[in-house]
């Protein structure tokens, strides 16, 4: 890789406000510990949202198999997720998205939702699974009044290990020294931080020698 952190995707866990009002639950860990028959709806198998939902459940101390022994889990398309939550047919959803994602934006504008804060232990467990800490800032969604500490997966620029070192150096330099221009083309790149782009936390593969040289020369 030439570096990571090109994006601002995060894990989002939401209960419907009706579920919170009727049950008193505000924590997924408590729901799982009490084996409450919660109704979860997410994207289909093979999506990052569905995979992240599995990881969240595991991070909260349950296997997916055990979770399904007391809860229900519908995996479907985004339109069905939206209508299912709006109609209170389901209690909860989990996804892995960026700010402004259309389905979540519409859900939060048309239905009262509760933004769930995962506990420190669950977040630490997700970090061991390859996710990186990220903050979902207050105001990201309608009705979200506080920051939510979350976990995201960082986008990387992957190149062949055989790439010429000078080319890798030049590409890394261009990426790190043109952040503003990149952000004008893709808004989420505004979160890219050249100071941390070469860190192990942001990179999902070994740094190319050309990238290493650039980061070492530039602190």
Please name every model-derived segment.
Residues 1-12, 140-149:
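A structural signal for short loop-to-beta-strand junctions that line the ligand-binding cleft
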Residues 5-8, 33-35, 108-109, 149-152:
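Extracellular/periplasmic catalytic domains that process cell-envelope and extracellular macromolecules
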Residues 8-87, 194-210:
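Bilobed "Venus flytrap"/periplasmic-binding protein-like clamshell domains
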Residues 17-21, 62-163:
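Pocket-lining segment of extracytoplasmic ligand-binding domains
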Residues 30, 34-37, 55-63, 84, ...:
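Structured segments of extracytoplasmic/periplasmic soluble domains
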Residues 41, 155, 168-170:
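P-loop NTPase catalytic cores that bind/hydrolyze ATP
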Residues 97-110, 115, 125-130, 166-219:
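An extracytoplasmic/periplasmic, membrane-proximal ligand-sensing/linker region
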């Amino acid at each position: 890789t030439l570096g990571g952190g090109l994006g601002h995707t995060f894990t989002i866990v939401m209960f419907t406000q009706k579920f919170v009002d009727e049950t008193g639950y505000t924590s997924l860990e408590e729901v799982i510990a009490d084996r409450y028959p919660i109704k979860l709806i997410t994207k289909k198998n093979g999506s990052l949202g569905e995979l992240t939902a599995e990881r969240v459940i595991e991070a909260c101390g349950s296997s997916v198999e055990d979770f399904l022994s007391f809860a229900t889990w519908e995996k479907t398309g985004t339109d069905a997720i939206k209508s299912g939550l709006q109609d209170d047919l389901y209690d909860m959803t989990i996804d892995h998205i960026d700010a402004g994602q259309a389905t979540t934006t519409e859900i939060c504008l048309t239905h009262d939702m509760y933004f769930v804060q995962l506990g420190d232990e669950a977040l630490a467990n997700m970090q061991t699974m390859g996710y990186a800490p990220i903050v979902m800032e207050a105001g990201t969604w309608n009705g979200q009044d506080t920051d939510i500490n979350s976990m995201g997966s960082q986008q990387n620029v992957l190149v062949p290990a055989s790439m010429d070192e000078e080319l890798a150096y030049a590409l890394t330099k261009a990426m790190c020294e043109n952040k503003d221009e990149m952000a004008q083309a893709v808004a989420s790149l505004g979160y890219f931080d050249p100071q941390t782009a070469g860190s192990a936390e942001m990179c999902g593969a070994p740094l190319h020698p050309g990238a290493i040289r650039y980061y070492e020369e530039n602190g």
